[in-house]
């Protein structure tokens, strides 16, 4: 980190751990696929532009569609640290950016008093040095300790209070944080910033303007099948097609919370654990709690709706 006058932060060339340059959408899409993340062309293009233009990327979509996973996958693919800020109501600057280590500061003062080495100006300077600074995720992301750009995941930003967005604006505009006692701390390596939102509230326009944007929808049948085959390869092909057809059908039912891709993967593993080789009434009704997380949805689907979806899934898998 540096407090020198404003300069353009250095940016590490975007490469994977093997040194291969991710210099095209195709290369990025292939790199994600190697990490078992199946991205459609639109998402891969937007992510490529975010990397190339050094712009934050705001991903919105329903819960469970893979927004958080892409940040984790990207960090693995780039061989760089993942720094995560999990947002929640009441999140403040002390938890998101920094705070002073008050207990250690007091201990330091007492030590100076005991040794008779108290000098007001020296003590004040020492107390408010980086030694006593507790760096939270946003400050960690611009820390000079990184030898390449980390991935900063600001997860579920819509759950945080709007006041947090004001703190984010400075970071996302200039990749810097101002600490009154230390000055302005600037990134030496621009972090790759991914923000996610489930759209429980609208994000302020000023924050959106600083980001590229992409909406991640529920996957199509073909994409869901490819993801399932990559993530849970031990699932027989016929059962995998049935699972995907069933979950696709569930999303057309008027549910409080339709299943996302995460639930599809969990359900596939659950069915394997139950010894199921294909969908049938018993296995489906017994395991609905894996893919549906509200009792009202379970009650609605169990029985007739499940039977209809099983029949449709069986026909779809046979096509």
Q: What is each stretch, according to the model?
A:
Residues 1-319:
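C-terminal regulatory/interaction module of P-loop NTP-utilizing enzymes
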């Amino acid at each position: 980190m540096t407090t020198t006058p404003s300069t353009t932060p250095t940016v590490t060339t975007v490469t994977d751990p093997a040194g291969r340059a991710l210099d095209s959408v195709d290369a990025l899409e292939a790199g994600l696929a190697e990490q078992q993340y199946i991205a459609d062309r639109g998402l891969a293009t937007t992510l490529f532009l975010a990397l190339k233009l050094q712009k934050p990327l705001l991903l919105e979509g329903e819960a469970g569609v893979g927004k958080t996973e892409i940040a984790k996958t990207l960090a693995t693919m780039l061989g760089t640290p993942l720094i995560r800020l999990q947002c929640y109501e009441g999140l403040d600057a002390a938890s998101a950016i920094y705070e002073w280590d008050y207990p250690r500061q007091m201990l330091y003062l007492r030590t100076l008093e005991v040794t008779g080495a108290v000098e007001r100006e020296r003590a004040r300077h020492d107390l408010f040095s980086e030694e006593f600074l507790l760096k939270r995720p946003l400050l960690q992301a611009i820390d000079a300790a990184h030898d390449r750009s980390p991935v900063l995941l600001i997860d579920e930003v819509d759950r945080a209070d709007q006041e947090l967005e004001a703190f984010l604006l400075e970071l996302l505009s200039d990749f810097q944080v101002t600490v009154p006692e230390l000055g302005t701390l600037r990134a030496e390596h621009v972090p790759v910033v991914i923000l996610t939102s489930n759209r429980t509230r609208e994000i302020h326009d000023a924050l959106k303007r600083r980001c590229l944007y992409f909406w991640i929808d529920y996957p199509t049948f073909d994409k869901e099948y490819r993801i399932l085959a990559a993530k849970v390869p031990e699932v027989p092909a016929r059962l995998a097609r049935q699972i995907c057809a069933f979950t696709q059908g569930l999303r057309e039912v008027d549910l409080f919370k339709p299943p996302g891709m995460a639930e599809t993967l969990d359900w596939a593993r659950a069915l394997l654990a139950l010894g199921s080789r294909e969908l049938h009434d018993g296995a489906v009704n017994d395991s609905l709690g894996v893919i549906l997380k509200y009792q009202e949805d379970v009650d609605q689907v169990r029985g007739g709706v499940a039977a209809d979806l099983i029949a449709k899934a069986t026909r779809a898998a046979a096509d």
